[in-house]
From Swiss-Prot:
GTP binds at L12, A13, G14, K25, N53, D70, D100. Monomer. It is found in: Cytoplasm. It catalyses: Mo-molybdopterin + GTP + H(+) = Mo-molybdopterin guanine dinucleotide + diphosphate. Mg(2+) binds at D100. Keywords: Cytoplasm, GTP-binding, Magnesium, Metal-binding, Molybdenum cofactor biosynthesis, Nucleotide-binding, Transferase. The gene is mobA. This is Molybdenum cofactor guanylyltransferase. One of its GO terms (cellular component) is cytoplasm.
Length: 195
């Protein structure tokens, strides 16, 4: 099994948050606590190597750990953050989680590490019905393929998965860990459920 200490984990907070009215999702409060703090609280017992990908409000995010922005500017979606994370992390294996999922599994890192094989390039979480492409673990050897993918302007992650040795990690026993909060209404509803 890959040791969790040999991985870095990047919290993806670099999006435009258009469905949240453009507000930086990681800094939006849920029950008086920024969303990113929920993610950090879940990740910290699992790994000591946490980084943050943010393209705005970097000074605010620095209180939580090292922060870096995308190298491919104005690239929609998480792929720019994944690319930057692979460049910035000091480990060969780099995991990614979104900043707006307060219920991340307490054994997420371990599950990913257990699934690694010698051939693995990319691991992607699967909830039993759908793949969860922002809950993922990449080996740095994917970086040249990902760079070429972004330079071509490709947006369909499934195309990159086909170029790499991609495997899926089973989270069908805990699909709620992928609940993400994209709109003010979802945030309000989730806050009421959590209270």
């Amino acid at each position: 099994m890959l040791q969790p200490t040999l991985t870095s984990w990047v919290i993806l907070a670099g999006g435009q948050a258009s469905r949240m009215g453009g507000k930086d999702k990681g800094l939006i409060a849920l029950n008086n606590k920024p969303l990113i703090e929920y993610v950090i609280d879940r990740l910290t017992p699992q790994t000591s190597n946490i980084l943050i990908n943010a393209n705005r409000n970097q000074d605010d995010y620095q209180q939580y750990g090292p922060v870096f922005g995308d190298h491919f500017q104005n690239f929609p979606g998480p792929m720019g953050g994944i690319h930057a994370g692979l460049l910035h992390a000091s480990t060969d294996w780099v995991g990614f989680v979104p900043c707006d999922c307060p219920r991340i599994n307490e054994d997420l890192v371990e599950r990913f590490c257990r699934a690694v094989t010698d051939e693995t390039d990319i691991l992607v979480a699967h909830d039993g019905n759908h793949q969860q492409p922002v809950f993922t673990l990449y080996h740095k050897r994917v970086l040249p393929k990902l760079t070429a993918f972004l330079e071509r302007g490709d947006r369909k992650i499934i195309l990159l998965y086909k170029e790499c040795h991609t495997q899926y990690v089973d989270f069908s026993d805990s699909p709620d860990c992928f609940v993400n909060l994209n709109t003010p209404e979802e945030l309000t509803q989730f806050g009421q459920l959590e209270s």
